[in-house]
Amino acid sequence: MKVGVIMGGISSEREISIQSGNSVVHALDKDKYEAIPIVLNEKEDLIEKVKGIDFALLALHGKFGEDGTVQSVLKTLGIPFSGCGPLSSAICMDKDMTKRILAFGNVRTARWEMVSSVDEIDYEKIENLGYPVFVKPNNGGSSVATTLVESKEAVKDAVLEALKYDTEVMIEEYIKGDEITCPIIDGKMLPVLAIKPKGKFFDIASKYGDGGADEFIVELNEDLHKEVEKMALETYKLLKCDVYARVDMLVKDNIPYVLEVNTLPGMTKNSLFPKSAAGINMSFEELLDTIIEKSLKVNRE
């Protein structure tokens, strides 16, 4: 089977995507698959470069990759692809829409406000959230242009920085707690990982640099584990995820809050999903096998 590993792209996470893609190409079982690296440099590359492949394994991150656009093109071309479909991908990429759906489904998430310009900043509402707050692009990943803002005076600059990457900016309540992540594959939760960033929060340097954070499988107390699993699977279902995704949470005073959902989690040597899979003795190669196998069974009609 010719498996095109699609990486690169046009988002701010291009370099991370290439790291993921190269890791995947090297890990794929050579006896089962002919791995074909497909590096996208511009949108127009996609249709030409996927010709002749039997399956698209997506190692893209960010806009035009994780947002449902590439999935829509592949679906139109009749090429099976890995992971979530166009709708779920688009919803999970939009942090505001994700949180609206979670709130509708009574899944706990941090409070937030949205702005499209500095003129829309409502300092009274931000005061109500309580400082510090996170300021981040609405559509974006890997914590690119995400700032932990300690005071009213710093809000405007943080919003301007985030607006360089998106037309909408989220101002989110800061919940000081323990960060965990819940990888899900085929509707089942893998071992939960704890994330202990060396800096103030799990930023881009922590996520992809060596030693930027301690990440390890964590044994939660029984009641908390049950609630985390229930929330993670409910989130996966509410957002119509398919095959695999990663649900990020914060736990404060034994109460979990959903942060966001990654529909194309990183697949580098430092990535969380492979670390979690290793906790049930699933190798990186076996994880990719499972993703391909389960993705081929999804009805994309």
UniProtKB/Swiss-Prot annotation:
Organism placement in taxonomy: Bacteria, Bacillati, Bacillota, Clostridia, Eubacteriales
An example Gene Ontology biological process: cell wall organization
Keywords, in A-Z order: ATP-binding, Cell shape, Cell wall biogenesis/degradation, Cytoplasm, Ligase, Magnesium, Manganese, Metal-binding, Nucleotide-binding, Peptidoglycan synthesis
HAMAP family named among the record's database cross-references: Dala_Dala_lig (MF_00047)
UniProt superkingdom: Bacteria
EC number: 6.3.2.4
Pathway linked to the protein: Cell wall biogenesis; peptidoglycan biosynthesis
Name of the protein: D-alanine--D-alanine ligase A
Organism of origin: Clostridium perfringens (strain 13 / Type A)
Coiled-coil stretches noted in the UniProt entry, renumbered to this chain: none
SUPFAM superfamilies in UniProt: Glutathione synthetase ATP-binding domain-like, PreATP-grasp domain
Alphabetical list of Pfam families matching this protein: Dala_Dala_lig_C (PF07478), Dala_Dala_lig_N (PF01820)
Limits of the ATP-grasp domain: 99-293
Chief subcellular location: cytoplasm
Family annotation (PROSITE patterns): ATP_GRASP, DALA_DALA_LIGASE_1, DALA_DALA_LIGASE_2
Cofactor dependency: Mg(2+); Mn(2+)
Catalysed conversion reaction: 2 D-alanine + ATP = D-alanyl-D-alanine + ADP + phosphate + H(+)
